[in-house]
Regions:
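Flexible, glycine-rich active-site loops centered on histidine and acidic residues
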Residues: 66-99
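Short glycine-rich or small-residue beta-strand-to-loop segments that form or flank ligand, phosphate
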Residues: 13-19
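Non-catalytic structural scaffold of enzyme domains
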Residues: 60-61, 69-75, 80-81, 173, ...
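Condensing-enzyme catalytic core mediating Claisen C-C bond formation in acyl metabolism
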Residues: 89-173, 177-180
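Phosphate/pyrophosphate-binding loops at sites that engage ATP/ADP/AMP, CoA/4′-phosphopantetheine
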Residues: 1-12, 178-192
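Conserved catalytic cysteine-centered active-site region
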Residues: 19-73
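Short beta-strand segments
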Residues: 17, 48, 73-79, 105-106, ...
Length: 192
């Protein structure tokens, strides 16, 4: 904010994307609004997404800014996914880490629109899931036990369970189609 020479009172929106929020309640975006010293008129929103989270967050932020009612917005994306994996799960550690980004977006009259292709397919939820710890399956003594899972790896029901092949297959089949759909929508040849 300082490097941009932005007045904190001009920031009208803060979106926080994470699957590892500070608390169940309140929303982390509200806490960040306060910690950053943004005014109480700042629109805040939490989005719970992983890999696609930055793109989804940017699409929401750009939509909020597109009419010029909000002039400046922040997109904060961060996860501490190392806390979600079991230290004994050798399939998890090479793929996940802790990271965060901050993206500042400003409305400029006459600037080009931002275009996105977003889609959702919840049918593969079992391919990457933390079975216990939320409201469908709360925390119990059974949740804490580290056991050998059906895939032969050690983890508790509070750790991320991932079918790497299913996640990989999803990524390599869906991502290219999403890019192609966006290019088609914008009438840009794929060769370009």
């Amino acid at each position: 904010i300082e490097e941009l020479h932005w007045d904190k009172n001009d920031i009208g929106c803060l979106i926080f994307v994470s699957q590892t929020p500070d608390y169940i309640l309140p929303a982390t975006s509200c806490l960040l609004q306060h910690r950053l010293g943004l005014n109480s008129e700042c629109y805040t929103l939490d989005i719970s997404l992983g890999c696609s989270g930055w793109v989804y967050g940017l699409s929401v932020l750009s939509s909020l800014l597109s009419h010029g009612n909000i002039k400046k917005g922040l997109l904060l994306v961060g996860d501490i996914t190392t806390r979600l994996g079991c230290r004994e799960d050798t399939s998890y550690w090479p793929l996940f880490g802790d990271a965060g980004t901050a993206t500042a977006v400003e409305y400029v009259e006459g600037a080009s629109d931002m275009y996105f292709h977003t889609a959702t397919d919840g049918s593969g939820a079992e391919a990457i899931i933390i079975p216990d710890g939320a409201y469908r399956n709360g925390i119990s003594k059974e949740s804490l036990k580290i056991e050998v899972d059906t895939d032969g790896l050690n983890r508790s029901k509070l750790n991320t369970k991932m079918d790497g092949m299913d996640v990989f297959a999803f990524a390599v089949s869906k991502a290219p189609k999403s890019v192609a759909a966006l290019l088609e929508k914008l009438q840009i040849p794929q060769e370009d």
